Structure formats: C-alpha cells, structure tokens
C-alpha cells in the first residue's frame, strides 16, 4: 500500500484527490491518502509518516499567511520523496519557483484528471526505494484529524467535544496524542505562525 500526503487548504482538493486515487479505477495500486490543511504541521507529518508521494498547493498558504510561510523547511522535509505542486491559476500572487530537483511536476488546478493521473503514476515510478508496508496506517486517526482541524480553527474544547459527541477529557487526550505524533512542544505550537494568533 502506497502512502500519499495531500497538503492543501481546500477540503475539496484533498477529498477529490483521495477519490481519484482510491475510487476512479485509474490506478492498479492501493493507496492510503492522508490530507492536511496546515503547512506548519506538514514537515513533521512528512518526517514521521514517510509518504511515497506528496501533492501540495503551497500557493494557498502564501496567499493566506501574513508572515513568511515555512516553505524551505517543507522542501527540505520532502528530501527525495517525489513532490507534485498544484497551483491555482486564479491566484494573484507570484507562483512559487521550486528548484527542479525538488518538484517532480508543477501543475495548475485546471489540469485534466487524465494528466494528473498520468503525472501521479510517473512520480510513483521514480520514487526512491522506500519500504512499502502491506498494511499502512495514517499518522493521525480520523478522529484525531477532526480534532486537529477544529483545534486549528480555534474551536473550544467543549465545542469540539459536543461536535464529535465525546467527553471533554477525551479532547485533551486527542490533543496530547496529536502533539506527541507531530512532535509539537506545547499546546499552543500549532498556532505559533498563524496570522492573528498570539497577539
């Protein structure tokens, strides 16, 4: 089972790529797809989970971040892992110009599904010889991903507990597990570089 990490602020892009990989019938391999909407957490996610391919729209983070986003640490964490960069054609900022040694391909989000599928197949063929586990597991459980998403949106623990129908103490446990898995130093770590946080 091949592990693919999709990094994009857009929920529809993350779920759409997962549907393309797992439900379109275009691929013969089986995939475990993990989606993340936070560039700050992407580096640790890559280092801990070791995906076989990373697909990312970095422009969405640049346009929404007032301070400089952690682009270079992101590229360094990818290392030899193939990277497909997606770019929104309707954005009004300068595109990211990664070195050719870093990105396998740069595509717009208006690329056809055939082209995207072909590019993914190519990237997976040139990937480094990483161990392919028979039963891969995501770094975060689906429930932890929900808690992280709401936590990043600034939702209170009580509201998270109510939304997920869990006890308030369970929210603390999930947050502790997320911090341990992503090697975050303290409970405020996910918010250190987000605009408007900590002011």
UniProtKB/Swiss-Prot annotation:
Residue ranges annotated for the HTH luxR-type domain, each copy included: 133-198
GO molecular function list: DNA binding
Domain Response regulatory, chain residue ranges per copy: 3-124
GO BP annotation list: phosphorelay signal transduction system; regulation of DNA-templated transcription
DNA-binding region (UniProt annotation): 157-176
UniProt cross-references to InterPro entries, sorted A to Z: Sig_transdc_resp-reg_C-effctor, Sig_transdc_resp-reg_receiver, Tscrpt_reg_LuxR_C, WalR-like
Claim: rRNA processing is one of the keywords in the record: no
Domain of life: Bacteria
Coiled coil: none
4-aspartylphosphate: residues bearing it: 8
Protein name: Transcriptional regulatory protein EntR
Species this protein is from: Citrobacter freundii
Organism classification: Bacteria, Pseudomonadati, Pseudomonadota, Gammaproteobacteria, Enterobacterales
Gene from which this protein is expressed: ecnR
């Amino acid at each position: 089972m091949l592990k693919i990490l999709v990094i994009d602020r857009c929920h529809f892009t993350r779920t759409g790529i997962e549907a393309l990989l797992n439900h379109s019938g275009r691929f013969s391999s089986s995939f475990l797809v993990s989606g993340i909407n936070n560039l700050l957490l992407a580096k640790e996610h890559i280092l801990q989970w070791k995906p076989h391919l990373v697909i990312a729209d970095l422009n969405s983070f640049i346009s929404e971040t007032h301070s400089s986003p952690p682009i270079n640490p992101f590229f360094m964490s990818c290392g030899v892992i193939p990277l497909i960069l997606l770019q929104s054609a309707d954005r009004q900022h300068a595109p990211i110009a990664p070195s050719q040694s870093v990105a396998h391909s740069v595509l717009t989000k208006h690329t056809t599904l055939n082209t995207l599928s072909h590019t993914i197949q190519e990237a997976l063929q040139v990937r480094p010889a990483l161990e392919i586990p028979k039963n891969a597991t995501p770094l975060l459980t689906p429930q932890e991903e929900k808690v992280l998403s709401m936590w990043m949106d600034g939702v209170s623990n009580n509201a998270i507990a109510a939304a997920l129908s869990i006890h308030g103490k369970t929210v603390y446990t999930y947050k502790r597990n997320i911090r341990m898995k992503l090697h975050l130093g303290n409970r405020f770590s996910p918010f250190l570089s987000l605009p408007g946080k900590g002011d």
